[in-house]
């Protein structure tokens, strides 16, 4: 894969893409979660190499997509994603979003209907307002002081252990977090949560109108992700695939099972 940059007024978005495109194969577009980067999908990129065209980004203000003015909204992230894909002549992507990446995927599908070939959610949750209690949304807007008041080593420990269950998954998450200094991390995570809350409060209609695969770690303890997925599955009549022994970063905790689930789903949709 080759590294490229997409320019915006707020900074450059760094992404990685197939060195040579395969016209007969679908595009898998991998979107990491809040504070994570492209390394989160290392095992998926290796597994699907040659089976599909691949693109993964470091979200704005994350990883190599820095410096970047951290004033973006979820809607802007979706618009930049669309513009980036259009610049690469990618018209019908399969969006693979982990956590915040899944929210960006839904915002993309709402703003650009009928563009997405399929959606794979990994430990994400629905954007529909009905799934959230008022105090949960209030809490998402007031996290900065909570984070900044904690020692950096405690933030690193809680982030790694809260997102992953395996030693490999915890180490990966900690390494991604160490890409930031404490203040930068606290500003980024609190901004991401605040913008997520604001997007949910818009009370838009988010319907999954393309083939969808819901994946969630059976030990996901990040917020209320497990509960949200149960509600989401019921609302969409689309069962959740629970990944054994995996936490919030299910694709790094148990990449073998997640890769098999994704591959079986793509085969079922006659995409690979």
Predicted regions: what they are:
Residues 1-28, 49-52, 90-91, 171, ...:
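Alpha/beta-hydrolase fold catalytic core
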Residues 236-272:
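Catalytic active-site module of serine/aspartate enzymes centered on a nucleophile-bearing elbow/loop
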Residues 55-96, 260:
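Active-site loop/oxyanion-hole signature of alpha/beta-hydrolase fold enzymes
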Residues 97-101, 105:
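Gly/Ala-rich beta-loop-alpha elbow adjacent to hydrolase catalytic centers
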Residues 14-64, 230:
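Conserved HGGG/HGGXW glycine-rich cap/lid loop of the alpha/beta-hydrolase fold
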Residues 130-132, 150-207:
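Conserved alpha/beta-hydrolase catalytic His-Asp/Glu region
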Residues 212-246, 252:
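Conserved loop-alpha-helix segment in the C-terminal half of the alpha/beta-hydrolase fold
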Residues 110, 116-148:
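Flexible "cap/lid" loop of the alpha/beta hydrolase fold
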